[in-house]
Structure formats: structure tokens, C-alpha cells
Curated annotation (Swiss-Prot):
Its main location: membrane. GO terms for molecular function: pentosyltransferase activity; peptidoglycan glycosyltransferase activity. Keywords: Cell inner membrane, Cell membrane, Cell shape, Cell wall biogenesis/degradation, Glycosyltransferase, Membrane, Peptidoglycan synthesis, Transferase, Transmembrane, Transmembrane helix. Disulfide bonds: none annotated. This is Biosynthetic peptidoglycan transglycosylase. Belongs to the glycosyltransferase 51 family. It comes from the Bacteria. It comes from Xanthomonas campestris pv. campestris (strain ATCC 33913 / DSM 3586 / NCPPB 528 / LMG 568 / P 25). SUPFAM superfamilies: Lysozyme-like.
Length: 246
């Protein structure tokens, strides 16, 4: 009897270890399943808010920015002036219609540029930016980068390109606390996003790298130069027709 009790005690640790191992093995599968369901849900559901908006709100609250307010209103892609999507593609990701989430040529160019000691340049595609802004937190850790790649693969797999672009122009930050085309059009020019002009659209695209530093409503010299360049690029790409599904 005493021996049986000793055997039971010796058996418990291996059983606990096996249970722990099962959880360790199951956790990645559970996360993968949950993330797939997330992405599938947002293929048809328009999110009322994104992680980047939550992050900015918490930042403002933590720093005591009493006057901060968040502006966002969803608009379907067909309710936004066609000049805006082509402007952001011309500015941010000209291979968007043809790549599968990652622009390897742009990544190589950015790596060479950064290796020469220039100001650090990114090579994130629109798909990667959607993954980051909708599902993840801000940061540069390898964990976040890995999750960004995973979500990028999922949205490219499960969402049509038009949905990715629609999500992008609705969650992108165009000014401090101003997210999406509709909020930007209202705050800057007092109009609906459907009435944005090509110049206004190009201005919004021009401030995307640093929307808290540059002002689309009162553009300085840099934004004006960038706006003109974006308009030229958009014309060279073929205008809004460049983004039409084949």
C-alpha cells in the first residue's frame, strides 16, 4: 500500500508535464484559428475602431491631453472619391494590385538605402499597414513584426484587394486624432469624402508618413512638392482605372 502511494506521487509530475506540453502545443493552433476567424469576420464587418486609434487615445489620456478628440467615420470605398485610393497607392505602394502582401523589390531597395547610412526608410505595403493598424500594437519588436507578417498573409488570402484598400483609407491617420477619409474630408475641408478633389486626395496621401508633423489643409513646401509628385505618379499609373479588379 505504501509502495502504491509512492508510485502515484511519482506519476503525477509526468502527467502535469504532459498537460503543460499539450497546452504549449495547442496555444499556437488556438491563436492561428482565432486570428483566421478575426480576419474572416472583418472581411464583411466594418470595424468601429482600430488598435492604432485605441493606442492614440490611451496615449493622449496618459499624457493628460485634455483637448484631444478622436474623429472617425466609416465610408465604403464607393462612397470615397476615386482620386484618394489611387493617390495613396501612388504614394505608398505602387505594386499593390499585383503583389501578395510584400514588395520584395521595395524591401531590397530600403535595405540598401539604410545600409548606406541614410535616414531609415521603410518598405511596408498597404497590406502590411492594414495588418498593423487594424490588428496589432505600434512598435518595432520582432514579435510584432512576425505577427504583422502573419496577419498580412491572412488578409491577402481572405480579403479581395478592394477590401484591403477600403480598410486602409478608413483607418489611416491623416492628422492627429483624424482617422479615415471621411473624418479628414470633414475636418480639413468641411465636405464629404465623395467630394474630395484630386489635389486634396494627393495632399492626404502626402502626409501619410507623418500625419502629426505635416498638415494637409495648410501644406508647407514639402507637402506641396510631395503632392505634385503623387499626382504625376497617379497619372502615370493610369488613374483610378489602375485599381479596377480584372
Amino acid at each position: 500500500m505504501g509502495t502504491d502511494g509512492l508510485d502515484d506521487k511519482q506519476a503525477r509530475p509526468p502527467r502535469r508535464a504532459r498537460r503543460s506540453l499539450r497546452w504549449v502545443l495547442a496555444a499556437p493552433l488556438l491563436f492561428a484559428a482565432a486570428s483566421v476567424l478575426q480576419v474572416l469576420a472583418l472581411r464583411i464587418i466594418d470595424p468601429p475602431i482600430s488598435t492604432v486609434m485605441v493606442g492614440r487615445y490611451l496615449e493622449a489620456w496618459g499624457e493628460g491631453e485634455a483637448g484631444f478628440s478622436l474623429h472617425h467615420q466609416w465610408r465604403d470605398l464607393d462612397e470615397i472619391a476615386p482620386s484618394l485610393p489611387i493617390s495613396v497607392v501612388a504614394a505608398e505602394d505602387q505594386q499593390f494590385p499585383s503583389h501578395h502582401g510584400f514588395d520584395l523589390q521595395a524591401i531590397e531597395k530600403a535595405r540598401d538605402y539604410n545600409a548606406r547610412g541614410g535616414r531609415v526608410r521603410g518598405a511596408s505595403t498597404i497590406s502590411q499597414q492594414v495588418a498593423k493598424n487594424v490588428f496589432l500594437w505600434q512598435g518595432r519588436s520582432w514579435v510584432r513584426k512576425g505577427l504583422e507578417a502573419w496577419y498580412t498573409l491572412l488578409i491577402e488570402l481572405f480579403w479581395p484587394k478592394q477590401r484591403i484598400l477600403e480598410m486602409y483609407v478608413n483607418v489611416a491617420e491623416f492628422g492627429d486624432g483624424i482617422y479615415g477619409a471621411q473624418a479628414a474630408a470633414r475636418q480639413f475641408w468641411g465636405k464629404d469624402a465623395s467630394r474630395l478633389t484630386p489635389t486634396e486626395s494627393a495632399r492626404l496621401a502626402a502626409v501619410l508618413p507623418s500625419p502629426r508633423r505635416y498638415d494637409a489643409r495648410r501644406p508647407g513646401a514639402y507637402v506641396q512638392r510631395r503632392t505634385a509628385w503623387i499626382q504625376r505618379q497617379a497619372r502615370q499609373l493610369g488613374g483610378p482605372g489602375y485599381l479596377q479588379a480584372p
